[in-house]
Design a protein with these regions (language model features):
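Acidic, surface-exposed loops and disordered segments
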Residues: 1-169
């Protein structure tokens, strides 16, 4: 049996994206509390994601959302990483409030924010190990968050389009 590389790209991209999520899941978490959520988007959901990006871009005047929507459309799949908001009770003040109790609802706990960053770094590192170029997108993450692709109550969502081509979109 001969498998032409072009014929197996999609399956390979999905496999790599799944491995990226494993890396995100197993990345170190603050206080050992895991509130990170991850998923892979492909097929029709990619188009819905791109359309939402365009709508947000038009509504807010963010031209880069329109550019990024085209990148998402050209991708084979998109890995998503976000976090559930949960104050870690350190009273560290890193969020801008003296204690966790004083923190305004909706203001992210910085430990959660750092956890997302570390998970994203682990995910793109895994992609790089397979020779796949990636770029972390705030734009696609915000659209995914608005669509609820990681579930209710998940915020700080970022997206990592996965493409296997001679030139990344």
């Amino acid at each position: 049996m001969v498998y032409d590389e072009r014929d197996i790209r999609k399956a390979q991209a999905l496999d790599i994206a799944q491995k990226m999520l494993v890396a995100a899941r197993t990345a170190p978490k603050g206080k050992g509390v895991d509130v990170v959520e991850c998923a892979v988007v492909d097929s029709d959901d990619l188009e819905a994601l791109a359309c939402t990006m365009e709508a947000v871009g038009e509504e807010r005047g963010f031209a880069f959302f329109l550019r990024d929507a085209n990148c998402v459309r050209k991708s084979l799949c998109v890995a998503l990483v976000g976090t559930r908001e949960k104050a870690q009770g350190l009273n560290c003040g890193h969020c801008g409030f003296a204690t966790c109790g004083e923190r305004t609802p909706g203001v992210p706990c910085e430990v959660n924010s750092v956890d997302v960053g570390i998970a994203l770094g682990a995910a793109v590192s895994r992609a790089q190990a397979f020779g796949v170029d990636t770029r972390i997108m705030f734009s696609a993450g915000l659209a995914a968050q608005q669509l609820g692709l990681l579930g209710e109550g998940v915020g700080q969502v970022y997206a990592i389009p996965v493409s296997i081509s001679s030139k990344s979109p």
